[in-house]
């Protein structure tokens, strides 16, 4: 969105760490729409020990997890841990020690820990602790949304080709993102939304 504001509407190629992505920005009156095309996605299970450590960080237990979406390392250009919760209340209650979270995220190479609750098969609520970046919580995380879309495809979730994400509602800065999910395993995910000026 910032590139579009400076250079006009268009598609921009970016290099982030080892990943190549494209971003789009288009002005629509006083608003700007933005979209990113992620690198290839992948996911892998995490160990039982690592899961216990992550649950303890947030004070969650196995009983708080949604068994349909197993905890996993997910990647759509950056690494994330996904923990799917089985209630909106548990998502809202999220709290953690930021320094301990940072140490865990740095050690495991996770940009964020993606906490998610599935309201429906295509509508998800998320929070993204971002201690890795020195921030308690990130209000809009396109990379995590792309990684989640890829993971849902990996596990055969009935996403119908797209999911909508409501993120950071509980921090008073709600964002809405859409991930378009092609059928080909590992293929790029398109994430889009409207940008606000900070």
What is each residue range found by the language model?
Residues 1-198:
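Active-site proximal loop and beta-alpha junction motif in alpha/beta enzyme cores
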């Amino acid at each position: 969105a910032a590139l579009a504001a400076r250079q006009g509407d268009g598609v921009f190629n970016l290099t982030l760490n080892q990943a190549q992505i494209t971003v789009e920005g288009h002005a629509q009156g006083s608003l700007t729409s933005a979209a990113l095309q992620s690198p290839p996605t992948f996911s892998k299970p995490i160990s039982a020990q690592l899961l216990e450590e992550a649950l303890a960080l947030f004070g969650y237990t196995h009983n708080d997890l949604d068994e349909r979406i197993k905890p996993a390392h997910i990647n759509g250009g950056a690494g994330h841990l996904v923990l799917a919760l089985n209630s909106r209340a548990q998502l809202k209650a999220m709290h953690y020690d930021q320094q301990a979270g940072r140490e865990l995220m740095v050690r495991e190479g996770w940009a964020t820990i993606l906490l998610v609750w599935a309201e429906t098969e295509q509508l998800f609520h998320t929070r993204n602790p971002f201690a890795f970046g020195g921030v308690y919580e990130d209000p809009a995380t396109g990379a995590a949304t792309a990684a989640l879309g890829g993971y849902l495809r990996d596990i055969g979730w009935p996403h119908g080709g797209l999911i909508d994400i409501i993120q950071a509602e509980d921090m008073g800065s709600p964002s809405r993102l859409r991930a378009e999910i092609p059928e080909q395993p590992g293929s790029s995910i398109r994430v889009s939304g409207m940008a606000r000026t900070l």
